[in-house]
Amino acid sequence: MVPEPGPVNSSTPAWGPGPPPAPGGSGWVAAALCVVIVLTAAANSLLIVLICTQPALRNTSNFFLVSLFTSDLMVGLVVMPPAMLNALYGRWVLARGLCLLWTAFDVMCCSASILNLCLISLDRYLLILSPLRYKLRMTAPRALALILGAWSLAALASFLPLLLGWHELGKARTPAPGQCRLLASLPFVLVASGVTFFLPSGAICFTYCRILLAARKQAVQVASLTTGTAGQALETLQVPRTPRPGMESADSRRLATKHSRKALKASLTLGILLGMFFVTWLPFFVANIAQAVCDCISPGLFDVLTWLGYCNSTMNPIIYPLFMRDFKRALGRFLPCVHCPPEHRPALPPPPCGPLTAVPDQASACSRCCLCLCRQTQIQTPLQGAPRACSSQPSFCCLERPPGTPRHPPGPPLWSTSLSQTLWSLRYGRIHSVPP
């Protein structure tokens, strides 16, 4: 969102020879700006293709991300290249009629990017605070309607005022000859900045703060529920040997620490997202208002702050997928050279050996899956009858369940002798024995 066409009562800038190009350091500046442009276009294009080609990513929530990446891609392809030429040469070097059109696209694309960030925060807010009702509230037609509304508002805040000359009402300043800068009046700047930045920023702060509070509350509830369930399970177990003193409290502290770390990670994630948004865009809008009030911002400083705002379109496709596991996995499948490290879960002690095969309660997707719990013995598989050696760590082995075998046959738990085994059942589900 930059810059400023026209003298008083004219929607086109004043033209003349203009200042010469910057004599020193222009090569390094051009190289840096080219890197920003290429990175912005490549990253946003990659993520748009990734969402469109990976079935796991085609959901309602990612509609908003596609809209965000589309607006950021337009910033990289339509807005940044003319802005780079304008910064390097110190004047508008393209066709005279393109100045107003480029300025309108500049305002529209950057405003659409900010409004899409607001929609993403709203979507996350509904998903976290009411996950059971989310599918009913955020349907695909409603998501598309919100996206269309955001783009319509961005277009109305850019093309309509500039074409009708509303930005010139009450203005008494003219740009330098050969410049393409939007020297808008103070009323226009206040209204446009409020609609496209300050109101969406307030909504983003509100939703992310509510998400943070909800994440902390859920972490505390899950920690207390888990420790309470573990304690109740211990009271009902027939323990053949006396557990070590302090074992229960140590495991409870470990679980509480785990959920505290999750809440801290959520806090850091939201802090990074909010921090990057305000660091990149807030200086520009403050300078834009100051420029309309006192004309005390130099063109060079204004260009730097403008490019800082453009960099938000570069950071969005890097920051948002960075904290989303689905994007990491899809990117690893889409790009063979990218290897995502496996997820590390807290190691739990393996259960004792037994000659039986166990089936978890959660085996809804496969009635044929069994959980191999033996460490050193061999289990006769119910299908082939061939022995199968079990590793030291639990692993899933897909086997057809014999016809007539109930999904959860009655029988005592396979193991229930210590707190660690109870925690294992809390994590992976209740375990029932299945006769071979």
UniProtKB/Swiss-Prot annotation:
Classification via InterPro entries: 5HT6_rcpt (IPR002232), GPCR_Rhodpsn (IPR000276), GPCR_Rhodpsn_7TM (IPR017452)
Intervals, Extracellular compartment: 1-27, 89-96, 168-185, 294-299
Transmembrane segments: 28-52, 63-88, 97-122, 143-167, 186-209, 267-293, 300-323
Family matches, as Pfam families: 7tm_1 (PF00001)
Cystine pairs: 99-180
A GO biological-process term: response to xenobiotic stimulus
Location relative to the cell: Cell membrane
GO cellular component term of the entry, any: dendrite
Cytoplasmic side: 53-62, 123-142, 210-266, 324-436
Protein name, entry field: 5-hydroxytryptamine receptor 6
Species in which this protein is naturally found: Rattus norvegicus (Rat)
